[in-house]
Amino acid sequence: MSFDHRKYRPVAVIDKPDRRWPNQRIEKAPLWAAVDLRDGNQALIKPMSVAQKRRFFQMLVELGFKEIEVGFPSASQIDFDFCRALIEEDLVPDDVHIQVLTQAREDLIARTFDSLKGAKNAIVHIYNATSPTFREQVFNVDKAGCKAIAVRAAEWVKENAAKQPDTHWSFQYSPETFSATETDFAIEVIDAVNAVWRPDQGQRVIINLPATVEVSTPNVFADQVEMVHDNIQYRDDVIISVHTHDDRGCGVAAAEMAVMAGADRVEGTLLGNGERTGNMDLVTAGMNLYSQGIDPGIDFSRMKEIVALVEEITDIQTHPRHPYAGDLVFSAFSGSHQDAIRKCLARYQEGDIWTAAYLPIDPADVGRRYEEVVRINSQSGKGGVAHVLERDFGIDLPRWLQQELAGVVQGDAEEDGGEITSERVHRRFNSDYLNVPMGWVLRSYDLNRSNEQVQAQISIGDDRQPVTLLSGRGDGAMSALVDALNRRIGGEVKVVSFDEYSLGDNTEANAMACVRVQVGDSTQSAVAMAVDTTAAALQAILSAVGRMQETSEQLIANS
């Protein structure tokens, strides 16, 4: 049996009845650290060149990141050269810390400090794996030996930093595989490292807690972080950071809960690039805060540009459903969704609190157009069809006509099996409702009122058909035309639905009329636009009757 759950065991959970983090709220953004140029880079099939790293670094600076991990200079000549270029060409703003990673070896730590000579602000990040799997199966050391590795590395970092006093140094330590480590042992190692670095004496220290591999639900990780927060020495003098991965799909949630549990800093990558299933996505985490009215401190307003550069350099395409950044995340195909969105957008005024249905943020905030929101396919309904006509062409239809047109468009979508553009919806609207049948163009009308009755003289025709004069009487212009049509075609013409609208000033016509006409058991709808409401109403009735006549003639011809 190859698919056998019995080969696994559940992760151990912490007995922590005094947990406080579930009642906490995130009220400000954590300190963000972008690790795209190191952790993200090492996961690429084709790692970045120095030129690509420079472009990526510049984008991170422009977005507002203040701590940027730039490489692993002791392990890569490209990373070493990149560090030197950043420093020697003065590419690092004064308020930005560059961060580098090194293993806990004396020669590699010395090489790392060589790469940082002349830096204004730098973070040296050391790590060693502390979980039972690594202690017992990979390195064959006991707990004491594991702790000794971390302490020696901390001493080497302190010694090398003292040789370069002009740099403002930050020291960072990660008990790698923290999420799979006994939490009390992780605290023991952290305290031993802090005893060397003495953050209480002014040294800036970051204690980074990695979910190197995500092994539990986010609440378990939050318990672990809160336990560290509550029990490490020098807590008020150190920055607790977290570094989550997405092996179980909860990297962002784990980081958010960790902040609730006391973390001050979060590491991640743009769009979540990283080993295996990726690092925590800084875009999602930042925009989650933004959607709650919290300034993330990072400018994601040019989302398409961010996505384009990340895709170009990493050669990884962004999923169309990726939160906040994917092509389809602000698109609605479902009819009920479209109807709700349309109504909410119609009510929204600049300056209002955003509460639109199905849109957690205003798409315009990240550079997206409202034109992308409602899109039409076979799942769309009247709301979506009405929305694209109103949005793109300024045409506002009555509900009964929305339903009718939606059925027509849905048939087209089912036949094609794909998306229907707004231009195609408009063409369908024109051909089925707005275009005037041959010979049924309103040429002129004359209305005379006498004894509460209107006598109408209406001429119809076009360049291809001779002009026909219609005469009728009624309570108003429309009823007079209906009377005239009944006399001409010998049927019982009834207007069963009618709506009229004024059009914007930027159109040739000033009025639009929508009608549904019934003759016997048949109905036909039509729309007309004209310079005044009377002309629009008369033309709409003429078009509807004309279409019925065309249909009857076609049926007779085909029988």
UniProtKB/Swiss-Prot annotation:
Keyword terms of this UniProt record: Amino-acid biosynthesis, Branched-chain amino acid biosynthesis, Cytoplasm, Leucine biosynthesis, Magnesium, Metal-binding, Transferase
GO molecular function term, any single one: 2-isopropylmalate synthase activity
Pathway terms, separated by semicolons: Amino-acid biosynthesis; L-leucine biosynthesis; L-leucine from 3-methyl-2-oxobutanoate: step 1/4
Location(s) in or outside the cell: Cytoplasm
UniProt cofactor(s): Mg(2+)
Domain Pyruvate carboxyltransferase, first and last residues per copy: 30-304
Residues annotated as binding Mg(2+): 39, 243, 245, 279
Pfam hit, one: LeuA_dimer
Major subcellular location class: cytoplasm
Example of a GO biological process term: L-leucine biosynthetic process
InterPro entries registered for this protein in UniProt: 2-isopropylmalate_synth_dimer, AIPM/Hcit_synth_CS, Aldolase_TIM, IPM_Synthase, LeuA-like_post-cat, LeuA_allosteric_dom_sf, LeuA_N_DRE-TIM, PYR_CT
GO cellular component, one term: cytoplasm
Cross-referenced PROSITE patterns: AIPM_HOMOCIT_SYNTH_1, AIPM_HOMOCIT_SYNTH_2, PYR_CT
Family to which this protein belongs: Belongs to the alpha-IPM synthase/homocitrate synthase family. LeuA type 2 subfamily.
Subunit architecture: Homodimer.
Role: Catalyzes the condensation of the acetyl group of acetyl-CoA with 3-methyl-2-oxobutanoate (2-ketoisovalerate) to form 3-carboxy-3-hydroxy-4-methylpentanoate (2-isopropylmalate).
Listed PANTHER family: 2-ISOPROPYLMALATE SYNTHASE (PTHR46911:SF1), PTHR46911
Name of the molecule in the record: 2-isopropylmalate synthase
Organism annotation: Alcanivorax borkumensis (strain ATCC 700651 / DSM 11573 / NCIMB 13689 / SK2)
Taxonomic classification: Bacteria, Pseudomonadati, Pseudomonadota, Gammaproteobacteria, Oceanospirillales
